[in-house]
């Protein structure tokens, strides 16, 4: 009989074998804070226009070279439960605002770092949390007073371009003026009268070659495809969209045919050909001159399409089909039947074009009232174009935020220093122990201009002392001058470096919530992971006989 070793009395006795648990300040709270600090430190160096890029190779061996925090976090696949909370907060910021994910991470990381100092000084966790929550509430009350201007006309391309400048600049420093103009043109052209802007209506098509300056905007859609038949250009296009293959019907049963003489052999496929001819003719007679199909195109069907001058475009992606239907106002048909006038889509022209050495099909709307706009990105490498796409994505999201709330606050660390100054004053008026936490919360705001300065290679302490000096004189809009050689400051409103009010509001709120949630954890209980050992990686034939 096997010797039974009793479990040690206490909490472990209740749990299954292999489960782990950590409790108390040292084991749980400080460990969690350490993990969050490490994560925030990783993305902190990527903050701002002069932020460094990260090279991430994910589990599928895809290479990412970017300074976009949302992409870095998505591909890192963070496992630590406390660090995951910070990742979730930044994902919430991504969904809510579409920009400012790095702000959430950096700010939450510094809040936790300063909370650790307070806990080691002897404050209790509840006092730190209470102080942080009071300070956060106060910060969100002060924020509306820091608004320096509002967007006046969201249908003016030049004004919109100047407002998108900052969000694009942090991803593509040097190309921001050109890209923000492109994004503004695309967004303004499809802004509906209701003002409800949909981010998905701005599409991106990436084609290798030339440079960023060769990028352009098209009203309509661009597909990285070639046409199937002989017709490559149609003006005043009427499009029929099919989600099925462009082919004759095939029976589900076996089609075995017994042929007795030569005449039967000659007439065998005539019926099929006539049927195909009638089907394609019916589509052409309905007025359609462009056919878009989601499946394969049969040779015989293609022959008759050429005969009746139909342009054939094949799209493999059902998402592309849906977006095209939205662009041209068509209904996707499940069978090869002639479309009615209501089911047909319409656009000014459909043509095959050559961009660089790549063939693309363009569905173009001449009027600027199309449902979808496409930004055609050019660049020397795929990684560069991916990064430009992320900058475009941030710009489009910023435009969406402006359609919801037109208020803007000064960027470049100006808002943060003003908040730090006012919350420190508020902390002085609080009598309890939570005043220490309130002052630390104010100190945490310094991390943003500090990160901007450090990433620009400037002495951070010098920048922060200069900013405080200017803000004490009442200049709320003065922030760090990122383009100066030394530690210099300038008016952000005059320089046009502005952040959205909603981006800051949600950033502060989500970062504080994430930090407080991590601090509230005093015990970690982990079950033993299910499943056996993972197969060894690298050897693709590890389960085959090695002696062959």
UniProtKB/Swiss-Prot annotation:
GO terms for biological process: protein folding. It is found in: Cytoplasm; Cytoplasm, Cytoskeleton, Microtubule organizing center, Centrosome; Cytoplasm, Cytoskeleton, Cilium basal body. It holds the Pfam family Cpn60_TCP1. Mg(2+) binds at residue 99. Its main location: cytoplasm. It is an enzyme of class 3 (hydrolase). Keywords: Acetylation, ATP-binding, Cell projection, Chaperone, Cytoplasm, Cytoskeleton, Hydrolase, Magnesium, Metal-binding, Nucleotide-binding, Phosphoprotein. Its EC number is 3.6.1.-. InterPro entries: Chap_CCT_theta, Chaperone_TCP-1, Chaperonin_TCP-1_CS, Cpn60/GroEL/TCP-1, GroEL-like_apical_dom_sf, GROEL-like_equatorial_sf, TCP-1-like_intermed_sf. One of its GO terms (cellular component) is centrosome. CDD domains: TCP1_theta (cd03341). The modification Phosphotyrosine is found at residue 505. ADP binds at residues 47-48, 100-103, 169-171, 412, 499. It catalyses: ATP + H2O = ADP + phosphate + H(+). ATP binds at residues 100-102, 170-171, 412, 499, 504. The modification N-acetylalanine is found at residue 2. Residues 529-548 are annotated as: Disordered. The keyword Transcription does not apply. Disulfide bonds: none annotated. Component of the chaperonin-containing T-complex (TRiC), a hexadecamer composed of two identical back-to-back stacked rings enclosing a protein folding chamber. Each ring is made up of eight different subunits: TCP1/CCT1, CCT2, CCT3, CCT4, CCT5, CCT6A/CCT6, CCT7, CCT8. Belongs to the TCP-1 chaperonin family. Component of the chaperonin-containing T-complex (TRiC), a molecular chaperone complex that assists the folding of actin, tubulin and other proteins upon ATP hydrolysis. This is T-complex protein 1 subunit theta. It comes from Gallus gallus (Chicken). The gene is CCT8.
């Amino acid at each position: 009989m096997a010797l039974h070793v009793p479990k040690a009395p206490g909490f472990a006795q209740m749990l299954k074998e292999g489960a782990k648990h950590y409790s108390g300040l040292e084991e749980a709270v400080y460990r969690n804070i350490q993990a969050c600090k490490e994560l925030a430190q990783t993305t902190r160096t990527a903050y701002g226009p002069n932020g460094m890029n990260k090279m991430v190779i994910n589990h599928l061996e895809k290479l990412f070279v970017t300074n976009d925090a949302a992409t870095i976090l998505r591909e890192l696949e963070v496992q630590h439960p406390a660090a995951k909370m910070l990742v979730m907060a930044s994902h919430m910021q991504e969904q809510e605002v579409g920009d400012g994910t790095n702000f959430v991470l950096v700010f939450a990381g510094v809040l936790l770092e300063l909370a650790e100092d307070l806990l080691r000084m002897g404050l209790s966790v509840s006092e730190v949390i209470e102080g942080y929550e009071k300070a956060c509430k106060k910060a969100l009350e002060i924020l509306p007073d820091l608004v320096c201007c509002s967007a006046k006309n969201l249908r003016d391309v030049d004004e919109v371009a100047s407002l998108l400048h900052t969000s694009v600049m942090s991803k593509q420093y040097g190309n921001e003026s050109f890209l923000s103009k492109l994004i503004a043109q695309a967004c303004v052209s499809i802004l509906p009268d209701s003002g409800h802007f949909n981010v998905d209506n701005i599409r991106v098509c990436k084609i290798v070659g030339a440079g960023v300056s060769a990028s352009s905007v098209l009203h309509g859609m661009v597909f990285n495809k070639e046409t199937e038949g002989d017709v490559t250009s149609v003006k005043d296009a009427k499009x029929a969209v099919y989600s099925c293959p462009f082919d004759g019907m095939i029976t589900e049963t076996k089609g075995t045919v017994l042929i007795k003489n030569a005449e039967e052999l000659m007439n065998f496929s005539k019926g099929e050909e006539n049927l195909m001819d009638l089907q394609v003719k019916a589509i052409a007679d309905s007025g359609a001159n462009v056919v878009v199909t989601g499946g394969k195109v049969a040779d015989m069907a293609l022959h008759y399409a050429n005969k009746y001058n139909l342009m054939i475009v094949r799209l493999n992606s059902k998402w592309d089909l849906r977006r095209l239907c939205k662009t041209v106002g068509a209904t996707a048909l499940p069978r090869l039947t002639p479309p009615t006038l209501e089911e047909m889509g319409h656009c000014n022209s459909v043509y095959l074009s050559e961009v660089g050495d790549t063939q693309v099909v363009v569905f173009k709307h001449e009027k600027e009232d199309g449902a979808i706009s496409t930004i055609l990105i050019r660049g020397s490498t795929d990684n560069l174009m991916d990064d430009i796409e992320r900058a475009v994505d941030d710009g489009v999201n910023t435009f969406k935020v402006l359609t919801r709330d037109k208020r803007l606050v000064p960027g470049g660390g100006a808002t943060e220093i003003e908040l730090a100054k006012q919350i420190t004053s508020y902390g002085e008026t609080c009598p309890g122990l939570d005043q220490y936490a309130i002052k630390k919360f104010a100190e945490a705001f310094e991390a943003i201009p500090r990160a901007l300065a450090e990433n620009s290679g400037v002495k951070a302490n010098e920048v922060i002392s200069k900013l405080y000096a200017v803000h004490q004189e009442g200049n709320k809009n003065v922030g760090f001058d990122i383009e100066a050689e030394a530690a210099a400051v300038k008016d952000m409103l005059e320089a046009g470096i502005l952040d959205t009010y909603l981006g800051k509001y949600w950033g502060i709120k989500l970062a504080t919530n994430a930090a407080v949630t991590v601090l509230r954890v005093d015990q970690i209980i982990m079950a033993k992971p299910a499943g056996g050992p993972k197969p060894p990686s690298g050897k693709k034939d590890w389960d085959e006989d090695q002696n062959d």
